[in-house]
Amino acid sequence: MVGKENFKTEDLNLCFEKLMMFGGGSAGAIALGCGKVKMEGRAITDWKDIPMELLLQILGLVDDQTVIMASGVCRGWRDAVCLGLTRLSLSWCTKNMNNLVLSLAPKFTRLQTLILRQDKPQLEDNAVESIANFCHDLQVLDLSKSFKLSDCSLYALAHGCPNLTKLNISGCTAFSDSALEYLASFCQKLKVLNLCGCVRTASDRALLAIGRYCSQLQCLNLGWCEDVSDVGVMSLAYGCPDLRTVDLCGCLQITGALQGNQCCYYQVA
C-alpha cells in the first residue's frame, strides 16, 4: 500500500526517475544527461544520492502520490518530507483513504492544508481524530462528502486544530448543530466555512454560535440548509463584521430581501 516503507527496488527506481524528470528544470541547479544528474559538481546516479535540499525542491513539483512514495524510501527522505510538507491532497485515493490517513497523520505533523474530498465515503471518526491529535498547525481542511463521520470528529477538531481558517464539511449529514456550536467556540479563526447540505448541522442555534465566536468569518455556504431562518442570518450579520458572501440556495425559511425559494448568493455590503 502507498505510504509503507517496504518498497521493491523497481519501485524506488521508478520514483527516482520520476523525481529526476521533474527536477530537471529547477533553476539550472540540475543537469540531466547520460543517466546522471549533477549538482554543484556532485554526480547523482541513484535515489540515495539526492541531497535533502534538492529533494524538497523536487517534491514541490510532483503529485501527492509520489510525495507519499518518497516518504517511504528511507529514513532521511521520510524526515525531510515530514518536516517540509505543508500541503497534501488524498482525493485521488478511492480505496482505503481512512487507513492511509491513520498511517500518515503521525508523520506529517507540519501540514497546514489537507484535502480529503471523497466521491465514495471512506473516512471514519478515528482518522479525523488522528488528524486532530497530530496536525495542530492545520489551517485548511476539506472533509466534503464524509458521510460516515459523526459529532466525534468535530469535537476532536475543536480541541486539536484551533487554527483552522477554512473548513469544508459540505454533505456531512450526520453532524449535529450542537457539535458545530462546540467547534465554533474553539476554532475562532474560521474565515471560510462550507455547510452546504448539512441539514442537521446548520440551524439558527449554530449560526448564533458562529456569530458569537467566529468574528473573522468572510464566506459561508448554507446551501440547502432548510432549518436556517432570518434569525440565524441576522446573528451572522451582527457578529461577523468581515462577512462578504453567504450562499442561501434552498434556504426556504429566509424571507424578505433574501428569498429562500431560489438560489441566492448574498453579497454583504
List PLM regions with ranges.
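A structural signal for leucine-rich repeat
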Residues: 102-106, 128-134, 154-160, 180-186, ...
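Short, solvent-exposed loop/turn at the beta-strand->alpha-helix junction
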Residues: 94-100, 120-126, 147-152, 173-178, ...
